[in-house]
Amino acid sequence: VADYIGDSFYLSKIAASAKEKTIVFCGVGFMGESAKILSPDKTVLMPAMDADCPMAHMATEEGIRKVREEYDDVAVVCYINSTAALKELSDVCVTSANAVKIVKALPNKNIFFIPDRNLAHFIAEQVPEKHFIYNEGFCIVHEFMDPEEVKEAKEAHPEALVLAHPECPQTVLKQADYIASTSGIIKYAQDSNNKEFIICTECGVQYKLETTCPDKKFYFTETVPVCKLSLIHISEPTR
């Protein structure tokens, strides 16, 4: 029934450019907030107000204040998967796709990345000239993805490439053939000559992958990587 399917930033941009004045955003709270920030004159409706992303709340005003007091030359970099309140307290907002580029361009030596520590560690590896201060937030799906199950999936599907989201811990990312945002994973699968992929991210992406790449096979870990707290209903993924 959706007119558009995609990640939060893509859909927020679609909402901003759409001629319609009312947007129905089927997603979690921070997604609707992001759409409203980019489209302040439009009405944004959320069908499930209790659908929420726990990670979006895993930073505090007090924590940000303490870091600003301790470091003079610090930029608070906020992941888009955060509440509007946290975005307001930050210096810049990034996506997983553009975070490395933006952090590299910042004049600040010290970077306080909120709320996700795994994405922060991934960015820090790409930008070694910066000093990162880590927040202890995490995605409840990616954080608990079992690296042993990823290994088992690779053994079960030896021809498959592993595509992982940078919100995954290092134990998973080290096994990946390619690391990217949700949109990056989809594009890689579309462009690749490979026919099989193990997907290390929330399995809601399966629909988009299978509809855009009907001739390819996608596998997930034995423990289904689904965000139950988001209340988004999906079908059982292929293992």
Where are these regions (language model features)?
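General beta-strand structural signal in soluble alpha/beta enzymes
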Residues: 1-7, 24-27, 45-48, 76-80, ...
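Active-site cofactor/substrate anionic-group-binding motifs, chiefly glycine-
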Residues: 4-54
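A C-terminal functional module that forms or caps the active site or interfaces directly
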Residues: 6, 177-231
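A generic, well-ordered mixed alpha/beta core segment in the N-terminal half of proteins
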Residues: 37-79
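Active-site glycine-rich loop that binds ribose-phosphate moieties when present
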Residues: 57-66, 85, 91-106, 113-119, ...
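Glycine-rich, Lys/Arg-enriched anion-binding loops that position phosphate/diphosphate groups
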Residues: 115-182, 189-190, 201
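Residue-level detector of conserved catalytic or cofactor/ligand-binding positions
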Residues: 232-238
